[in-house]
Amino acid sequence: MQLNASEISNLIKDRIKGFDGAAESGSEGTVVSIADGIALIHGVSDVMYGEMVQFDEATFGMALNLERDSVGVVVLGEYEHISEGDKVTCTGRILEVPVGPELNGRVVDGLGRPIDGKGSIDAKVTSPIERIAPGVIERQSVDQPMMTGIKSIDSMIPVGRGQRELIIGDRQTGKTAIAIDAIISQKNTGVKCIYVAMGQKASTVNNVARKLEEYGAMDNTVIVAANASDPAALQYLAAYAGCAMGEYYRDRGEDALIIYDDLTKQAQAYRQISLLLRRPPGREAFPGDVFYLHSRLLERAARVNAEYVEKFTNGEVKGKTGSLTALPIIETQAGDVSAFVPTNVISITDGQIFLETGLFSQGIRPAVNAGLSVSRVGGSAQTKAIKKLGGGIRLDLAQYRELAAFAQFASDLDPATKAQLERGKRVTELMKQKQYSPLTIAEMAVSLYAANEGYLDDVEVEKVLDFEAALHAYLNSNNADLAAKINAKGDWNDEIISEVKAMIDAFKANGVY
């Protein structure tokens, strides 16, 4: 029997008309391949981008690549027990982490699970790790100070509540030290703190937790730790989990501070995941969306207005603004701030604190380069006292740097230049500060006033810090009322100035330093 072409065509058409195979849409699939923490799954056509999928009772993954025939899933945890052919189920949920005051004083992993051996956390609220940042209308300008207790930062590079201030520098320049001091400085202010450690050694994170406990700051702090030994997925997600914990306070009219230590390692973890998912690499092998990786994270740090808080809390909290202040940390290679990730984060943030290896080696710690560091919005948030006194300090340091370079080639200098150089040496010495010893507003104001008014000019450079320590002790013991007055409002009026002047004159007359 022979069929001609038209009969074959009619047969095919009849078959097509009678076909009743509805396309299967499944919420259950099969593992096609598993390697390096990335599972390729077939059959889960219903899955959303970023959805949690379940391998077994204890193992979850996150869908990051949605392709025509398969889904690329990053496994959140150990993956050695997963094998080809295993069943995978969609959960229909986006990744959420526990948030709220129950986490204070605890160390958790990148998914909010406790890792400090202090038992489970019974958080009443969970929050998705990815949220859209508040819009322009919902924000309020930054006009309240976030005091770090570090003279060089609060006087020259001030940080406000709701600001994003980058801490950038080479390894071993004191970046984490500044962040930890900022947390310690908040212990009596009611500001809640979140310290996110990504790609750090477990011993380093343990040391941070110990220091915060020692200085009484752990009670209002939660540490989110995705250590170097943890999967890249947890190192990538930890920052978003920490941000969700901070947003809990921001949206309820409270103030929170979050430290990302550090975003360089987070970007490297994301690069690793992207390359394993076979996404096309770009500059320095980073994927094309690495800018968005950090911008969507840092834009969530903001000061929100009272209307936003009232709407979010359904009218429970009225007339209060909330803020989330971010201090992201970036590690540079040999001082190269023009690399891909540093330039991205510099452009996203509201200023940067630039730390220099050279200054650190000279013993100037914190090693802040006042010339390259800037705060774009913090000036309007400074306390009155520090704002009035800080300008003179910055000017003295700038003139000192200029003259010091010139003085290397000049044989004899006029008296005015010599006096400026001597003043600059003492101000540089005064800007040094020991770790774990943040200052109060009053202590800082008195130190800056002493420098501006020339009280340090007859003090030997080596004794400047001894002079300052003795002056603070004298202020807190003999003039506690004056210190309390300055700390309460941060005012700097004629009455306070005359009291401070009389106090320093009396102190210098004693000469006990």
UniProtKB/Swiss-Prot annotation:
Catalytic activity: ATP + H2O + 4 H(+)(in) = ADP + phosphate + 5 H(+)(out)
Gene Ontology CC entries for this record: plasma membrane; proton-transporting ATP synthase complex
Membrane topology: Peripheral membrane protein
Binding residue positions for ATP: G169, D170, R171, Q172, T173, G174, K175, T176
Keyword ATP-binding: yes
Entry keyword Cell membrane: yes
Molecular-function annotations in GO: ADP binding; ATP binding; proton-transporting ATP synthase activity, rotational mechanism
SUPFAM superfamilies, sorted: C-terminal domain of alpha and beta subunits of F1 ATP synthase, N-terminal domain of alpha and beta subunits of F1 ATP synthase, P-loop containing nucleoside triphosphate hydrolases
Annotated site (Required for activity): S373
Subunit: F-type ATPases have 2 components, CF(1) - the catalytic core - and CF(0) - the membrane proton channel. CF(1) has five subunits: alpha(3), beta(3), gamma(1), delta(1), epsilon(1). CF(0) has three main subunits: a(1), b(2) and c(9-12). The alpha and beta chains form an alternating ring which encloses part of the gamma chain. CF(1) is attached to CF(0) by a central stalk formed by the gamma and epsilon chains, while a peripheral stalk is formed by the delta and b chains.
Protein's UniProt name: ATP synthase subunit alpha
Gene: atpA
